[in-house]
From Swiss-Prot:
Functional pathway: Phenylpropanoid metabolism; trans-4-coumarate biosynthesis; trans-4-coumarate from trans-cinnamate: step 1/1
UniProt cross-references to SUPFAM superfamilies, sorted A to Z: Cytochrome P450
The protein, known as: Trans-cinnamate 4-monooxygenase
Main localization, broad class: membrane
Transmembrane regions listed in the UniProt entry: 3-23
Lineage summary: Eukaryota, Viridiplantae, Streptophyta, Embryophyta, Tracheophyta
Membrane topology annotation: Single-pass membrane protein
Record Pfam families: p450
Compartment annotation: Membrane
Reactions that this protein is recorded to catalyse: (E)-cinnamate + reduced [NADPH--hemoprotein reductase] + O2 = (E)-4-coumarate + oxidized [NADPH--hemoprotein reductase] + H2O + H(+)
Amino acid sequence: MDLLLVEKTLLALFAAIIASIFISKLRGKRFKLPPGPVPVPIFGNWLQVGDDLNHRNLTDLAKKFGEIFLLRMGQRNLVVVSSPNLAKEVLHTQGVEFGSRTRNVVFDIFTGKGQDMVFTVYGEHWRKMRRIMTVPFFTNKVVQQYRTGWEAEAAAVVDDVKKNPKAATEGVVIRKRLQLMMYNNMFRIMFDRRFESEDDPLFVKLKMLNGERSRLAQSFEYNYGDFIPILRPFLKGYLKLCKEVKEKRFQLFKDYFVDERKKLGSTKSMDNNQLKCAIDHILDAKDKGEINEDNVLYIVENINVAAIETTLWSIEWAIAELVNHPEIQAKLRHELVSQLGPGVQVTEPDLHKLPYLQAVIKETLRLRMAIPLLVPHMNLHDAKLGGYDIPAESKILVNAWWLANNPDQWKKPEEFRPERFLEEESKVEANGNDFRYLPFGVGRRSCPGIILALPILGITIGRLVQNFELLPPPGQDKVDTTEKGGQFSLHILKHSTIVAKPRVL
């Protein structure tokens, strides 16, 4: 950093201190703010709580300050909600007031400052994007159109694992093959395309760029520059890398997928009844002037991240828990055999006949929630919540993981026990009918991908348990389930090596 930049930073720091003190006094008179640790000028609570605002750290703060608390992170207000009643207020009762998305220096790059659907503010653009994405992605018709493809992809995973001699002895990182499956599941829907193998050069490049995008976006290491603008010059290299990754991804999306589909469409005359895949519907909306070319790419961006990775994390968590709980794995296998018959492979229409499989999925989503803090919400205007004033443009986090793991709300929540969803919690569903359990959120900004995720989880987990005895690698009693939390993600820290012994069907 040159001398001029240092001088400017120090001048900005002095000005910000004066402004912070003034605003703090003004707001102290105006607002009845939620409780929280006492902030200091400029940095707020950042020096006290640091960058790592994962679900467990926020749970510890909730135990100290209550079901709603405020963190002043530099110039940003961060309100954390940790009770079902307040979650209902944010997501349902006051869903319009808290229906926007907060800004973030990194997500601003990856979403073009909200040109996508997931991270845009609540309003006309969001309604338009949600409508355009719903028909080709998030309906029962889509499930029925693509379910046989999902079943074929799961069958291919089973075949490939059986062919790998290491799988039944020393074990394999099965996640790698499942990642290819998930890309194929979603790229069938998006582009009527699939990748033949893990070594496909285009798949390798796409996976690498998407992985780097997720790492950069979910990391806590850029928080200081996002919260405290005077420190943003220190993020220059980080943000430059984000821009480079975005440009490479979008060029790849455009050259190899969107433009290829355009060329195919130009050689055929297709009306709406002949549109084969999601991108056809989206390009049709662009041709009608409803969205622009950039919006098309941001939709592809959303699906590449939100639909693929989150479902993959949940599959990986489910496998790890079944390996570590062989009695649950055996009970699930017994249900599959007794309900479907020996050797009969589970299909999507079978899922409603398999309550224990559904309970295993629900329990995985409860204990190992892929998005434990949901996607952050924001109020565009001053609002009220829990008897407190919430200043405009506050970032609102719903700690959905704690809602589903609070011992005051659940019986022995630390245990992986699918039976709870067949016994005392039998009426609780993943669609948000109970505000203690919100793996996909609820309300206007809930995740529409639930309609795809649940059947894919059921087919994949069911087939793996039918065809293999899933075990930890030699010399280990269990696989490591240490968590890796992100800005609002939760995945397993170390991708597990799993022994998959083929079963005689």
